[in-house]
Amino acid sequence: MLILTRRVGETLMIGDEVTVTVLGVKGNQVRIGVNAPKEVSVHREEIYQRIQSEKSGTPSEGGNY
């Protein structure tokens, strides 16, 4: 895993078309902004896992099934 340090307002690049910008830090929460082409899906991890479990027909942890 690559670990980077960024300050509020600073950006990192993923490939040529995806940028991640630190928008703010409040306590232990970090707000980030992601700019990516429409064909690139961007999800929080828990949402991505729910999507994957729904595709496979397996209930996700904490799901309402």
Curated annotation (Swiss-Prot):
Subcellular location(s) per record: Cytoplasm
Indicate where this protein is primarily found: cytoplasm
Gene3D superfamilies for this protein = Translational regulator CsrA
Instruction: Report the protein's function.
Output: A key translational regulator that binds mRNA to regulate translation initiation and/or mRNA stability. Mediates global changes in gene expression, shifting from rapid growth to stress survival by linking envelope stress, the stringent response and the catabolite repression systems. Usually binds in the 5'-UTR; binding at or near the Shine-Dalgarno sequence prevents ribosome-binding, repressing translation, binding elsewhere in the 5'-UTR can activate translation and/or stabilize the mRNA. Its function is antagonized by small RNA(s).
Complexes and interactors:
Homodimer; the beta-strands of each monomer intercalate to form a hydrophobic core, while the alpha-helices form wings that extend away from the core.
Q: Which family does it belong to?
A: Belongs to the CsrA/RsmA family.
State the protein's name: Translational regulator CsrA
Species, as recorded:
Shewanella frigidimarina (strain NCIMB 400)
